[in-house]
Amino acid sequence: MKYGKIRIEDGNFIFSKHMMMNYLPCKDIIWTYKRKEGVEGGAQKQYSTSSLVIITRRKKRYQFEMTDREIQNCIQLMRALNPQMVTGFPQGSRISMQSLPNTRDLGALETEDGRHILPKRLLRSGSLYHISITDQDMLTHEYHLSTVVDFRTRMECLEKPDTIIEGVQYHEIPIVDEETLGITRLGSPTELLRNFKEIPEEFMLKQYESLVHDEYSIKQYARFLDVLLHQNEGAVLWHCSAGKDRVGVGTALLLCALGVPKKTIYEDFMKTNMYLDKEMEYMIRFLETKMIVDNQVMDKIRLFYRVKEEYLDIVFETIKKDFGSMDMFMKKALYMNPKNMEVLRKKYLV
């Protein structure tokens, strides 16, 4: 099929550059989207142009000016030839999986300098304890998962160990010790109900504050970023128990290091409420069978399964109070000096 100055034949995306024909296998394209430039309308007549943007596994970027219809048809054909190719801007959306409700690909999130996180490289999640075989296959073959970072404590790992996926490297980096684990631990419904009466809402704010104030936790987040620095191929997935507190803060710190604006960081953080909604409904139904659901218990359930902007507020406030700025926190606490920051961005941005 021919689209403007390019064509697709025998599974290859073919185009001319510098008077030479180039053959790009469609299976090597990981991301493609439509880019609009210029402005339409307004007081003076202006124009916009549409381009097809293609990103390859080697992070090479190509842009071809085409009509909207040509772009649409071209993407459809390439997607048929390469079903694993990402199209459009998922922007940190949930990965549709059977057994993992809060697993997300940070791909396509935009940085302040206009770059984007590469899709299928950075994945945040909850526990992999009950991951289905279908979901394992998806992570292995579609996302090329190569590394898992477990933020849980040793006791949590023993109680609900990760399902080991062949060919994947595992790192245990407990963000908190057993004594300060608190509500971030996802226990059984009975355990949670017993703790609900003991844990005030203020505890959550203190918990988030400690994640960037406690020396142990800070060093563990530094280890997490170091794993990402030394990752060469495939996707990295990091998780805790529910994928909201320890993972939420770790993801926020990573996005800061990559130069993602705060507004986007907050949006990603708050998506947990949407993705854990069904888990919360299940818990409520379970407790209703025990005839022990009142308004106070309901409030505690929501406290556990939801996040608030205030939680991330206190993270940034604590960092500013202790280190003066996020830049100093990155440099002094997480060892993300300008050189390491640039290495990280070269690995995961395009």
Model-found features: residue ranges?
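Ser/Thr-glycine-rich phosphate-binding loops at phosphate-binding pockets of nucleotides
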Residues: 242, 246-247
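Structured surface patches comprising rigid loops and adjacent beta-strands/short helices at the edges
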Residues: 26-30
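A broad, structural micro-motif
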Residues: 8, 23-24
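Cys-dependent protein tyrosine phosphatase-like superfamily
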Residues: 3-4, 10-11, 19, 31, ...
